[in-house]
């Protein structure tokens, strides 16, 4: 019997999840399909009830539903609870359990580009205050980094700092983030600013960026955002979102099937389908 997996979010026109997952299933010899469901916030409740009735085995969750989905689940695990965000839902004995593979997926991509593979005491600036930012901050906290979070809407950054008040974290205005950029070891963009098709935009000005800073962008389409292109021209080490995207997807598949997919196969397919 064909297993059914999928992705819910809005909008989903840019997503490479279906081609990545189906390539992984084929490589694994798994009889499964992965469908994208473009669901607006207003439709979320009805859509979840329909998916449950259809017997879907599991699904991923992306913008803007990572927080709102929690109200419709039977249970969430410890990591998802700490982040207040879910990106993976697993059907276990008829119960829907929320998990979050974004945090581990991101750190697995970041640590190899950090000089000594340690973030302890490193100063990290996170731009954005959505579900992806929650995952990144949770992951950085586990690594004992010193975190600043900044967002266009300052109140949202403050709310995030309060949520993670057990960590070494502060919320700062975006103009302060730009003026103090030279004090950070890692800069991470978790927003959708610069994502296809609006590829000319940047979430922060890099005028005060020091060359030793690692610049990371969770966006994977385009392969190099305007932010990463400028950082690269300045001589900085850069990290795009493909590693995190592949890693979180692979970890989701492990939760659903108990098997490890071929991540190199998944990455190859994503690269092939980028604009």
Swiss-Prot record:
Gene name per UniProt: aroE
NCBIfam families: aroE, PRK00258.3-3
Superkingdom in the source lineage: Bacteria
Keyword Chloroplast part of the UniProt annotation: no
Gene3D superfamilies to which the protein is assigned, alphabetical: Leucine Dehydrogenase, chain A, domain 1, NAD(P)-binding Rossmann-like Domain
Protein function: Involved in the biosynthesis of the chorismate, which leads to the biosynthesis of aromatic amino acids. Catalyzes the reversible NADPH linked reduction of 3-dehydroshikimate (DHSA) to yield shikimate (SA).
PANTHER family attached to this UniProt entry: BIFUNCTIONAL 3-DEHYDROQUINATE DEHYDRATASE_SHIKIMATE DEHYDROGENASE, CHLOROPLASTIC, SHIKIMATE DEHYDROGENASE
Binding site for shikimate: 15-17, 62, 87, 102, 220
Species annotation: Shouchella clausii (strain KSM-K16) (Alkalihalobacillus clausii)
Protein's name in the database: Shikimate dehydrogenase (NADP(+))
Keyword field contains Protein biosynthesis: no
Family, similarity comment: Belongs to the shikimate dehydrogenase family.
Enzyme class: oxidoreductase
Pathway linked to the protein: Metabolic intermediate biosynthesis; chorismate biosynthesis; chorismate from D-erythrose 4-phosphate and phosphoenolpyruvate: step 4/7
GO molecular function: NADP binding; shikimate 3-dehydrogenase (NADP+) activity
One Gene Ontology CC term in the entry: cytosol
Catalytic reactions of this protein: shikimate + NADP(+) = 3-dehydroshikimate + NADPH + H(+)
């Amino acid at each position: 019997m064909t297993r059914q997996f999928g992705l819910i979010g809005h909008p989903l026109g840019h997503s490479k999840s279906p081609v990545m997952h189906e390539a992984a299933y084929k490589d694994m010899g798994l009889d499964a399909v992965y469908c994208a469901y473009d669901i607006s916030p207003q439709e979320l409740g009805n859509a979840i009830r329909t998916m449950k009735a259809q017997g879907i085995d599991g699904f991923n969750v992306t913008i803007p539903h990572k927080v709102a989905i929690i109200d419709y689940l039977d249970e969430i695990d410890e990591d998802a609870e700490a982040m207040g965000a879910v990106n993976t839902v697993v059907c276990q004995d008829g119960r829907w359990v929320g998990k979050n593979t974004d945090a581990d997926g991101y750190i697995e991509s970041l640590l190899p580009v950090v000089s000594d593979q340690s973030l302890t005491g490193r100063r990290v600036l996170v731009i954005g205050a959505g579900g992806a930012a929650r995952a990144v901050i949770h992951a950085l906290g586990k690594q004992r980094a010193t975190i600043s979070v900044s967002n266009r809407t300052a109140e949202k950054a403050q709310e995030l700092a309060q949520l993670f008040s057990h960590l070494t974290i502060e919320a700062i205005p975006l103009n302060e983030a730009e003026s103090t950029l030279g004090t950070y070891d890692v800069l991470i963009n978790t927003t959708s600013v610069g994502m296809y098709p609006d590829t000319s935009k940047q979430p922060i000005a890099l005028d005060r960026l020091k060359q030793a800073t690692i610049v990371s962008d969770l966006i994977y389409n385009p392969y190099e955002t305007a932010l990463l292109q400028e950082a690269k021209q300045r001589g900085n080490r850069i990290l795009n979102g493909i590693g995190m995207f592949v890693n979180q997807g692979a970890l989701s598949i492990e939760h659903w099937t108990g098997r490890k997919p071929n991540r190199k196969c998944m990455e190859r397919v994503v690269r092939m389908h980028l604009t």
